């Protein structure tokens, strides 16, 4: 999971990367990066209590770039309801397409630059 509860936001990518490393060290051929979401009740209560924040699209891209860049088996990003993690409507379609391309090709494409948000 990317950005599980009780993990400070600034440590989320580091812990996701460590999870990818661990899965590969255990022999996993496929690893999925799943952004932790509110909406199931428990996460909502933790968010209200200040113990959970949803990850950002930047964090998912960072973790995917790391995982795919290792070239130690396949790494996939869960793209369901991805728009909730984006803060920019201008570049979101391109960034979503980039992650989809990563899922399909297992290559690390050039990052999208956006004059509106970056």
Predicted stretch roles:
Residues 3-7, 37-40:
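Short, catalytically relevant binding-site loops at active-site mouths
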Residues 4-18:
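Canonical radical SAM enzyme core domain
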Residues 17, 22-118:
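Auxiliary Fe-S-binding modules of radical SAM enzymes
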């Amino acid at each position: 999971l990317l950005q599980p509860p009780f993990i400070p936001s600034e440590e989320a990518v580091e812990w996701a990367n460590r999870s990818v490393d661990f899965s590969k060290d255990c022999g996993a051929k496929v690893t999925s990066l799943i952004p932790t979401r509110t909406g199931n009740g428990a996460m909502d209560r933790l968010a209200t209590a200040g113990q959970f924040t949803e990850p950002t699209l930047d964090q998912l891209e960072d973790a995917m770039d790391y995982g795919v860049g290792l070239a130690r088996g396949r790494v996939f990003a869960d793209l369901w309801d991805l728009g909730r993690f984006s803060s920019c409507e201008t570049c979101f379609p391109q960034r979503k397409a980039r992650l989809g391309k990563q899922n399909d090709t297992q290559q690390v494409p050039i990052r999208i630059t956006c004059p509106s948000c970056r």
